[in-house]
């Protein structure tokens, strides 16, 4: 990603792997990871029963720059809604319900702490 150091990219990728494991353990069925188009990226797309979950993953080693969930601004939420509509259109996927989740990953020593906020926005 432009503007991100290799270290930050590595931390983010690790956080996404932690989030994916969490979702699978919770019974969700991932269908896409790091889906990209010219307008942005969706970290994880997964089925939670009949509900399609669009998942944004935020990973932090410290809260110096705010909590992971605070990084999901209104602007980011609007972009994710547009990206989800585009993914649905491009893949021809039909979903009666689409939910937007945020997975907050904190890496503060010891095992990662994963918080899954279903329907975050």
Swiss-Prot record:
<dbReference type="InterPro" id="IPR011856">
    <property type="entry name" value="tRNA_endonuc-like_dom_sf"/>
</dbReference>
<dbReference type="GO" id="GO:0003676">
    <property type="term" value="F:nucleic acid binding"/>
</dbReference>
<protein>
    <recommendedName>
        <fullName>UPF0102 protein Strop_1320</fullName>
    </recommendedName>
</protein>
<dbReference type="InterPro" id="IPR003509">
    <property type="entry name" value="UPF0102_YraN-like"/>
</dbReference>
<dbReference type="InterPro" id="IPR011335">
    <property type="entry name" value="Restrct_endonuc-II-like"/>
</dbReference>
<dbReference type="Pfam" id="PF02021">
    <property type="entry name" value="UPF0102"/>
</dbReference>
<comment type="similarity">
    <text>Belongs to the UPF0102 family.</text>
</comment>
């Amino acid at each position: 990603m432009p503007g991100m150091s290799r270290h930050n990219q590595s931390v983010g990728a690790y956080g996404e792997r932690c989030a994916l494991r969490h979702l699978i353990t919770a019974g969700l069925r991932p269908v896409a990871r790091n889906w990209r188009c010219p307008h942005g990226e969706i970290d994880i797309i997964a089925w939670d029963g009949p509900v399609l979950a669009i998942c944004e993953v935020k990973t932090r080693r410290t809260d110096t720059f705010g909590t992971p969930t605070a990084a999901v601004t209104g602007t980011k939420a609007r972009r994710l809604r547009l990206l989800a509509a585009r993914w649905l259109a491009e893949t021809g996927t039909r979903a009666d319900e689409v939910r937007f989740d945020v997975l907050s990953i904190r890496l503060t020593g010891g095992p990662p702490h994963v918080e899954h906020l279903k329907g975050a926005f």
